[in-house]
């Protein structure tokens, strides 16, 4: 599944894998763009898989004219060895019935590569929040049992709110309670599979609506940064904080190209 850029596979033992879920507003993917661009992470390989819709494009993190012609595909892996971070970026949607096989293959690779833990950046439909969620922060987290043992004290010190359980079938009053992440894509599948395989995984998500989701992505990376300290906090002013993240060059066309002058 994983194909390295070099002749041999990189040593990822003890690394933290950051990855997005293809979810509402593409918030996780936008957040990953910010992380990869800000940390100037190097591409170390890609996933060769039939589970994602094929796509190809220019280098989304181009900084010069020279590297702007490099190609990118639907699932690429980047790393920053100095921080023991590896990042998977997903750029297309899943082919029908292929999301679960992808999750299984991905987690098998996580185990075989020796990654210490996985952090999934995701989102969920804001309109499906319950009354309690409407009155509190839009951010939530989930930890697998094996992850709780190692980071529970740190998470508690951050005063974060864990994702609440809700009725499995909202329309039925006496249905059982379970974790539901509407609009979360593969988030729930990844979480459930990681629980059963005893993989250390954390899910960080934000309740959002479709639209211009750049502010949501900035909020999500700051939420992650509270824990991992990817960037050292400089100020309590959120505008100063947000400006520290490097916007990738590909975001210039996030909403399409400009209007052609011929129209006028």
Swiss-Prot record:
Post-translational changes noted in the entry: Degraded by the proteasome upon completion of 20S proteasome maturation.
InterPro entries, A to Z: Proteasome_assmbl_chaperone_2 (IPR019151), Proteasome_assmbl_chp_2_euk (IPR016562), PSMG2_sf (IPR038389)
Phosphoprotein among keywords: yes
Compartments where located: Nucleus
Annotated effect of mutating residue 225 to K: In PRAAS4; uncertain significance
Single GO term (MF): molecular adaptor activity
Tissue: Widely expressed with highest levels in lung, brain and colon. Moderately expressed in muscle, stomach, spleen and heart. Weakly expressed in small intestine, pancreas and liver. Highly expressed in hepatocellular carcinomas with low levels in surrounding liver tissue.
GO annotation, biological process: chaperone-mediated protein complex assembly; mitotic spindle assembly checkpoint signaling; negative regulation of apoptotic process; proteasome assembly
Keywords for this protein: Chaperone, Nucleus, Phosphoprotein
GO cellular component, one term: nucleus
Pfam families in the record: PAC2
Quaternary structure annotation from Swiss-Prot or TrEMBL: Forms a heterodimer with PSMG1. The PSMG1-PSMG2 heterodimer interacts directly with the PSMA5 and PSMA7 proteasome alpha subunits.
Disease: Proteasome-associated autoinflammatory syndrome 4: An autosomal recessive, autoinflammatory disorder characterized by panniculitis and erythematous skin lesions apparent in early infancy. Additional features include hepatosplenomegaly, lymphadenopathy, autoimmune hemolytic anemia, fever, generalized lipodystrophy, myositis, joint contractures, and mild motor and speech delay.
Function: Chaperone protein which promotes assembly of the 20S proteasome as part of a heterodimer with PSMG1. The PSMG1-PSMG2 heterodimer binds to the PSMA5 and PSMA7 proteasome subunits, promotes assembly of the proteasome alpha subunits into the heteroheptameric alpha ring and prevents alpha ring dimerization.
Protein name: Proteasome assembly chaperone 2
Source organism of the structure: Homo sapiens
Gene: PSMG2
């Amino acid at each position: 599944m994983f194909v390295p850029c070099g002749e041999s596979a990189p040593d990822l033992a003890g690394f933290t894998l950051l990855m997005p879920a293809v979810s509402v507003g593409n918030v996780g993917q936008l957040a990953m763009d910010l992380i990869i661009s800000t940390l100037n992470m190097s591409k170390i390989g890609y996933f060769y898989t039939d589970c994602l819709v094929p796509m190809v494009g220019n280098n989304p993190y181009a900084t010069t004219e020279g590297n702007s012609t490099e190609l990118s595909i639907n699932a690429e892996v980047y790393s920053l060895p100095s921080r023991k971070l590896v990042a998977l970026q997903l750029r297309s949607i899943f082919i029908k019935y292929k999301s679960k096989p992808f999750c299984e293959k991905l987690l098998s690779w996580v185990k075989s590569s020796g990654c210490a833990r996985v952090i999934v950046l995701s989102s969920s439909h804001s309109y499906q929040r319950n009354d309690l969620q409407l009155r509190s922060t839009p951010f939530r987290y989930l930890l697998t049992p094996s992850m709780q043992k190692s980071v529970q004290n740190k998470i508690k010190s951050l005063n974060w709110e864990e994702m609440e359980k809700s009725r499995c079938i909202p329309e039925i009053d006496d249905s059982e309670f379970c974790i539901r992440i509407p609009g979360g894509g593969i988030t729930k599948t990844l979480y459930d599979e990681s629980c059963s395989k005893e993989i250390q995984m954390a899910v960080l998500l934000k309740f959002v609506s479709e639209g211009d989701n750049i502010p949501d992505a900035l909020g999500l990376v700051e939420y992650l940064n509270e824990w991992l300290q990817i960037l050292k906090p400089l100020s309590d002013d959120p505008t100063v904080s947000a400006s520290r993240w490097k916007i990738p060059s590909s975001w210039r066309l996030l909403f399409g190209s400009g209007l052609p002058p011929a129209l006028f």
